[in-house]
Regions:
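Active-site and donor-binding regions of nucleotide-sugar-utilizing enzymes
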Residues: 1-201
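Conserved catalytic-core segment of nucleotide-activated headgroup transferases in glycan assembly
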Residues: 2, 199-279
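Short, charged/polar "capping" segments at the starts of alpha-helices
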Residues: 24-31, 176-179, 235-236, 274-280, ...
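Short acidic-hydrophobic, aromatic-tinged amphipathic segments that line or gate anion-handling sites
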Residues: 36-41, 287-291, 341-352
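Donor nucleotide-activated moiety binding/catalytic core segment of transferases
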Residues: 109, 113-115, 268-314, 318-319
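Structural motif
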Residues: 120-121, 168, 224, 266, ...
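Catalytic binding pocket for nucleotide-activated donors in carbohydrate/polymer assembly enzymes
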Residues: 163-166, 187, 311-369
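Leloir-type glycosyltransferase catalytic cores
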Residues: 203-210, 216, 239, 339-385
Length: 385
């Protein structure tokens, strides 16, 4: 979401743009040709020995080839050490065992980043860990903050609406603006811009590439389903209720059963960046579409997206692909896809077969009108430069 804005701003060559790209985001930043900063750039060997030891321990079981071991060790270790310093060793271990990375809020490390980089403006998203920590630190450093809110902010509003969290918010639509203002945000700070990450969805070359993908893979008149994989936490990271980590795999099993029961279905399964692909039957009707597949192109090539709480559902709706929301996530209330007109139904896992049977073969929907967001976000940013 930040990369399209940073790319256009850097191309104007009027300001120096540095992008903090953590873990899997680093390759996206590199691919855009932007100046990349990572946690490895801020390791201080004289004080970080304990942190790096934590990092090596936590990274030992990782198998993600997209992220270097050094960056994984630095990110996990520095973040975990910050957690220990805030809550104590025993509580840190308990929180990490329950929440994993959702327990992190590495304020001390982001303070180190701002002290070294000395930016005139910080642009963040509403992500709850490092970017929230940046906002906290920027306030202490008296650096203005522009926050790009990706979606509905149902959970994040708890801190977005706090005093002086950001100097400006860029939001998806009027509904989100009203929600933030009602929750306590200054209406003069909230700007309806759209989401820059979605601009690429309507590019004519992307649309044409979707048609070409169907032709290349000989999908022809097949009905192509897409399942975007998600990780479901055992506990909601901000609310005190329990999740079901098995829900995504159970939903995928139902999709596989439906696919293999028919000869006119293709099921595309898309792991998240950094996520290991699930074990699936070897069958030409089941296709793993990894991170090397362009998501925007893929969305123009499929007919139905079946999803839990993921932004892929919103992107699918914006290109005119039908969306079915599967219930069972701790984030269901955070993603009101039916209420927003994005998903045409929301169903429990047990109803997947029926929901697909009545929708397979229906034409794509008319995509909603939306205007490019990157230029609108830049207008907001330039008020602070």
């Amino acid at each position: 979401m930040v990369v399209p804005v940073a790319t256009e701003l850097a191309a104007e060559n009027t300001v120096a743009v540095e992008v903090l790209g953590l873990t899997t985001a680093a390759n996206v930043v590199r691919g855009a040709g932007l100046s990349l900063l990572q946690f490895t750039d801020f390791v201080d060997p004289s004080v970080d020995c304990a942190a790096l030891a934590h990092g090596r321990r936590l990274a030992a079981n990782l198998s993600n080839g997209e992220v270097t071991l050094a960056e994984s060790v630095a990110y996990l270790g520095l973040s975990y050490r910050d957690l220990e310093e805030r809550v104590g060793a025993e509580q840190a271990a308990a929180l990490y065992a329950t929440l994993g990375r959702h327990a992190f809020l590495p304020v001390s490390i982001l303070d180190r980043v701002l002290t070294k980089v000395k930016p005139d403006l910080v642009v963040i998203t509403n992500s709850p860990r490092s970017e929230r920590a940046v906002a906290i630190c920027a306030k202490n450093h008296k650096i203005p903050v522009v926050c790009i809110v990706d979606l509905f902010a149902a959970d994040e509003v708890k801190w977005l609406a706090s005093d002086n969290y950001a100097d400006a918010f860029c939001v998806l639509n009027e509904f989100i603006k009203e929600f933030l203002v009602t929750s306590g945000c200054d209406p003069g700070k909230v700007h309806v811009t759209g989401n820059p990450a979605f601009d690429r969805l309507r590019d004519p070359d992307t649309i044409a590439a979707g048609s070409e993908l169907r032709r290349t893979l000989a999908w022809g008149d097949k009905h192509v389903l897409l399942w975007p994989c998600v990780d479901e936490p055992a506990v909601h990271p901000f609310e005190n209720f329990v999740g079901d980590p098995s829900a995504p795999s159970r939903a995928l099993l139902k999709l596989v059963e439906f696919c293999l029961s028919r000869n006119d279905i293709i099921l595309c399964v898309r792991p998240r960046p950094g996520q290991q692909a699930p074990c699936l039957p070897i069958d030409p009707r089941i296709v793993i579409t990894g991170a090397d597949w362009n998501l925007a192109v893929l969305l123009h090539a499929v007919n139905i997206v079946v999803a839990m709480s993921t932004t892929v559902a919103i992107e699918a709706h914006l290109v005119g692909t039908r969306v079915i929301k599967i219930l069972g996530s701790v984030f269901d209330k955070s993603m009101p896809l039916v209420e927003q007109g994005i998903a045409e139904c929301e169903i429990p896992i047990c109803e997947i077969h029926h929901a697909l049977t009545v929708r397979v073969g229906l034409p794509n929907i008319m995509p909603p009108l939306f205007l490019p967001a990157t230029s609108k976000v830049l207008e907001v940013i330039k008020k602070f430069l």
